[in-house]
């Protein structure tokens, strides 16, 4: 059965084109269209409904030990209010999911997982828990809104005191409020822009949504759908589960070495990653130089030799040209090399470029 977020009716009323994603009915775009929504986030501000994401509480004396065992990153030195990104590996080193962990206190962590994986992730956590710890799926009680763009903070400051807003990226303020609505304010996002993600009670979602849109009118804030969220994350070269990673692809192959702490005593998948050694494949960026757009699942060649396949691809509104990401043989190409993708039997040329494609000016 397809699920609806608390904002479903608001999306329909606003002219959102509804599609299924991760088991949920969500707007892929509004009447403004993907390009305008994308550009609003790069130049002004956009508001996304991300309530399909899953939330899990991890509580207890052994919460930290459990996180360090189940996840690849190290959570030992986190301070209260800090957030940390991490892959979660299976015993073979493949990626179960990628997620964000927020620390509220030594015995209380708030975990945010991908929508399509939330049941799988929760069961994985329960299966591997040990000691004094409780994992609790609280997804149904939460809505998540993402306010993103260079003017996001300007808008937010109209609705809450500055001390309620995290100063640093990947930090959060718990038990705070925006426009009198209780929430968690997190300085995170999936767009490559400045901004926040707000976690709040589901029943308050529509009130918060309308309040933010009204407050941001002067700054050009508009609602944005999944289409713009995807093109924005591609420009920022952020991996998406099911594309750049899955149960068979390791986080090291995806280029997430920064979030895999091999110096830790142990974690699920560590021995498999050690056995594999240096990754045999790598994620690369492609700037399309030929005619056409390279989408996902296209074979990539150097001459007649197939070296891998694309995982995501689109035309980027802000950059003004098509891009793609691909997983290829690790020693096959370097930055500056030319490759070709097979697009429905036709070869389309592309240059290997450094990731990310887009990085905002600080």
Predicted features and spans:
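Internal amphipathic helical hairpin motif
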Residues: 61-95, 153-181
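Acidic, proline/glycine-enriched N-terminal capping motif
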Residues: 1-86, 94, 227
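Conserved, structured C-terminal
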Residues: 1-16, 20-22, 26-30, 105-362
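Acidic active-site catalytic centers that drive phospho-/nucleotidyl reactions
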Residues: 49, 98, 197
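Membrane-targeting and insertion segments and their boundary/processing signals
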Residues: 37-41, 92-95, 99, 179-186
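Well-ordered mid-protein domain cores that form the structural environment of catalytic cofactors
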Residues: 74-128
């Amino acid at each position: 059965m397809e699920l609806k977020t608390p904002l479903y009716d608001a999306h329909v009323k606003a002219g959102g084109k509804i599609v299924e994603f991760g088991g949920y009915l969500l707007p892929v775009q509004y009447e403004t269209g993907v390009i305008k929504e994308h550009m609003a986030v790069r130049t002004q501000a956009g508001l996304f409904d991300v309530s399909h994401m899953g939330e899990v509480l991890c509580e207890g004396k052994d919460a930290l030990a459990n996180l360090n065992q189940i996840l690849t990153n190290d959570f030992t030195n986190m301070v209260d209010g800090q957030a940390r990104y991490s892959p979660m590996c299976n015993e073979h080193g493949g990626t179960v999911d990628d997620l964000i962990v927020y620390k509220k206190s030594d015995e209380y962590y708030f975990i945010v997982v991908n929508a399509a994986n939330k049941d799988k992730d929760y069961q994985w956590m329960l299966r591997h828990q040990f000691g004094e710890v409780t994992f609790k799926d609280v997804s149904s009680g939460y809505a998540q809104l993402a306010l993103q763009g260079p003017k996001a903070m300007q808008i937010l400051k109209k609705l809450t005191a500055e001390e309620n807003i995290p100063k640093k990226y990947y930090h959060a303020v718990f038990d705070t409020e925006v426009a009198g609505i209780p929430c968690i304010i997190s300085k995170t996002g999936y767009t490559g822009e400045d901004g926040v993600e707000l976690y709040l009670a589901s029943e308050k979602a529509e009130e918060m949504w309308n309040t933010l849109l009204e407050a941001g009118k002067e700054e050009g804030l508009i609602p944005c759908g999944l289409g713009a969220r995807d093109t924005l994350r591609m420009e920022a070269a952020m991996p998406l589960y099911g594309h750049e990673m899955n149960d068979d692809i390791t986080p090291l192959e995806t280029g997430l070495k920064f979030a895999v702490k091999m110096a830790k005593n142990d974690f699920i998948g560590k021995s498999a990653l050690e056995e594999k050694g240096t990754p045999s494949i790598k994620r690369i960026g492609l700037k399309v130089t030929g005619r056409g757009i390279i989408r996902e699942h296209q074979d990539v060649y150097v001459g007649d030799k197939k070296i891998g396949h694309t995982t995501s691809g689109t035309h980027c509104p802000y950059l003004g040209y098509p891009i793609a990401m691909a997983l290829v043989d690790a020693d096959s190409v370097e930055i500056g090399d030319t490759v070709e993708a097979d697009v429905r039997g036709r070869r389309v040329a592309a240059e290997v470029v450094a990731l990310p494609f887009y990085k905002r000016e600080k």
